[in-house]
């Protein structure tokens, strides 16, 4: 996003299948550099509704996990305004776990698109752009230092260009 008022978002889902086990996982978090309380409320309400349709305990459990997972200890703050994170999801009901993971994916547009549309044409200034570049630096710090997937992929021979493609093209500290 070029406009500093339009938030960045991260979302992924995954399924692992080995000869002896399977599980699902995913992460979905909002990373605005200029926070709007109404945007944060909409984002979390949309996620909560999607989670509750599958298990009323999912949203509080996975939100708490996201709050912990996306926290940057050396900064004493989260990289954004939260979301959900889950891993090792295997309730014993593959169909139900797959349905939940698909629902997380289908929640992306209703959770994020209204926020992007509301802010993408908003006026911004050099201070706003500076805030965006600093926040992008925060996002890069998190991904390079703490993200499990990034660390795993870089240490197991994956293509660094593919692994690092989610990093912002410009950042500032």
Segments predicted by a language model, with ranges:
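Long, contiguous binding/interaction regions
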Residues: 5-7, 110, 114, 150-173
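Internal mixed beta-strand/loop scaffold within catalytic domains of large alpha/beta enzymes
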Residues: 1-24
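Mature, function-bearing regions of proteins
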Residues: 20, 31-37, 82-85, 90, ...
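Aromatic/basic-lined ligand-recognition segments
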Residues: 13, 25, 66-92, 137-139, ...
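A structural signal for the principal folded core domain
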Residues: 66-84, 97-105, 121, 161, ...
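Compact, glycine/acidic-enriched structural inserts
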Residues: 20-65
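Extended, compositionally biased non-globular segments
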Residues: 93-146, 151
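Short loop/turn segments at secondary-structure transitions that flank enzyme active sites
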Residues: 5, 17-19, 34-36, 90-92, ...
């Amino acid at each position: 996003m070029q406009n500093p008022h339009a938030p960045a978002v991260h979302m992924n889902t995954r399924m692992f299948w080995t000869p002896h086990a399977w599980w699902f996982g995913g992460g979905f978090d909002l990373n605005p550099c200029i926070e709007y309380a109404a945007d944060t409320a909409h984002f979390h309400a949309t996620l909560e509704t999607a989670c509750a349709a599958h298990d009323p305990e999912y949203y509080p459990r996975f939100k708490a996990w996201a709050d912990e997972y996306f926290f940057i200890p050396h900064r004493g703050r989260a990289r954004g305004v939260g979301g959900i994170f889950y891993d090792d999801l295997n309730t014993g009901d593959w169909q139900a776990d797959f349905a939940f993971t698909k629902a997380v994916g289908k929640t992306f547009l209703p959770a994020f698109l209204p926020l992007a549309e509301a802010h993408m044409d908003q006026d911004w200034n050099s201070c706003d752009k500076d805030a965006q570049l600093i926040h992008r630096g925060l996002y890069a710090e998190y991904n390079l230092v703490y993200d499990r997937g990034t660390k795993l992929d870089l240490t197991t021979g994956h293509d660094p260009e593919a692994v690092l493609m989610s990093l912002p093209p410009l950042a500032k500290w």
